[in-house]
């Protein structure tokens, strides 16, 4: 039976930093995002180890414990695409901040709600702040790629609850509602 999602998570894929070289002097990178049964892909940026995508990908989050996997590939015309690293996106700290609900309305614009430190248990390369900004909660992350010699990916998370979504606060408290 198909379960209604808690909400929609928009992942703003901003850019790659110092990605590995997989062709002669450069790479043709693109990103694949996987969460549960959903797979999304960015466009290929040709001949660039510091690509700028500035693309938004939105995934339905049904189970907040299912990992979001980001994998970078090098596009090849004649052979299989080469893997250029991967990272898991840990959304648990972000979801905890969302559960603050109405308390957030009292915060000043630009206020950092929570700071997440890099550790062995996440793929962060630097501290990441979860911020209340213009009526939304966002989190900027720079992810260190695993299984590769170098490379980072800069993304931003943003949550949306629309019609047909259970909502993050109602899932933890049994039937609340959210307002925007």
Swiss-Prot record:
InterPro entries: C2_dom, C2_domain_sf, CAR1-11. It holds the Pfam family C2. GO terms for molecular function: GTPase activator activity; metal ion binding; phospholipid binding. GO terms for biological process: abscisic acid-activated signaling pathway; positive regulation of abscisic acid-activated signaling pathway; positive regulation of GTPase activity. Its main location: membrane. SMART domains: C2. Residues 1-105 form the C2 domain. Coiled coil: none annotated. Keywords: Abscisic acid signaling pathway, Calcium, Cell membrane, GTPase activation, Lipid-binding, Membrane, Metal-binding, Nucleus. Stimulates the GTPase/ATPase activities of Obg-like ATPases. Mediates the transient calcium-dependent interaction of PYR/PYL/RCAR abscisic acid (ABA) receptors with the plasma membrane and thus regulates ABA sensitivity. Binds to PYR/PYL/RCAR abscisic acid intracellular receptors in an ABA-independent manner, both at the plasma membrane and in the nucleus. Belongs to the plant CAR protein family. This is Protein C2-DOMAIN ABA-RELATED 10. It comes from Arabidopsis thaliana (Mouse-ear cress).
């Amino acid at each position: 039976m198909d379960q209604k999602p808690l909400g929609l998570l928009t992942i703003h894929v901003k850019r790659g930093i110092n990605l590995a070289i997989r062709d002669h002097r450069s790479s043709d990178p693109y990103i694949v995002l996987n969460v549960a049964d959903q797979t999304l892909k960015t466009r290929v940026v040709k001949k660039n180890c510091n690509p700028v995508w500035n693309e938004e990908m939105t995934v339905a989050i049904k189970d907040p414990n299912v990992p979001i996997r980001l994998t970078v590939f090098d596009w090849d015309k004649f052979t299989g695409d080469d893997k250029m690293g991967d990272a898991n996106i840990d959304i648990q700290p972000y979801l905890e901040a969302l559960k603050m609900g109405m308390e957030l309305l009292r915060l000043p614009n630009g206020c950092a709600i929570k700071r997440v430190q890099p550790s062995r248990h996440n793929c962060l390369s630097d501290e990441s702040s979860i911020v209340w900004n213009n009526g939304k909660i966002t989190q900027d992350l720079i992810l260190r790629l695993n299984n590769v010699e170098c490379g980072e990916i800069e993304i931003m998370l943003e949550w949306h609850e629309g019609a047909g979504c259970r909502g993050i606060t109602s899932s933890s408290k049994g039937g609340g509602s959210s307002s925007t």
